[in-house]
Amino acid sequence: MIKAILFDLDGLMVDSEPHSIASWQAVLAKRNVQFDQAALDSVLGQRVIETAELAIRLFHLPDRPEDLAQEKAEYQIAHLNGNVTAMPGLHELLDFVDQSGLKKAVASSGLRRYIDAVLTTTGVRDRFSVIISADDVINGKPAPDVFLAAAKKLNVHPENCLVLEDAPFGVQAAKAAGMTCFAVPNAHSHALELSLADRILSSLHEVKTILLSDE
């Protein structure tokens, strides 16, 4: 029985992947290098620190991972307005979750400051009392840490949690946590491997329909 829904942020709740990519490319352009699409796909859903580590390895950059990750996050936050919007069906789904008495949390690979900024920009910050970020866990996705931490904070057993994800690493993390997972791929993740998910949906609108049919 589902008692809580754990929401990924980037690419699931908000259409932010293009802005995230543009932010990385802007930061790397200062160093005269650029990620290709394969590199970007390989880190989709991971923490910013892990993407920074990849950039440093690929391009032999002198930066510390922490500094590069912070620079990217600061650029991304500074340019949020007009570049990040709520995914179709998000507000309606949050209304349904609240009306149903289900618990909910954001469980994201993003830094906490970034998550707060995005949720505020899209008008849903006050709808979440539980937010687990990259700052709160040792291991990022595909490790299950972020989802297990969210379940613990909500006081809900993992088997009673439904994770909504858009990326392969997130789906792997959810299943490693022993949770049900619905994948909702977007334009950037639709061609990636999401077969571990319990269901693959076309939009957030479908989540309510499925939960109602399972009652």
Residue ranges and their predicted role:
Residues 1-42:
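Active-site neighborhood of HAD-like aspartate-dependent phosphohydrolases
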Residues 27, 47-62, 118, 150-151:
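Helix-loop "lid/cap" segments that line or gate small-molecule binding pockets
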Residues 34, 56-92, 100-102:
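Metal-dependent phosphoesterase signature
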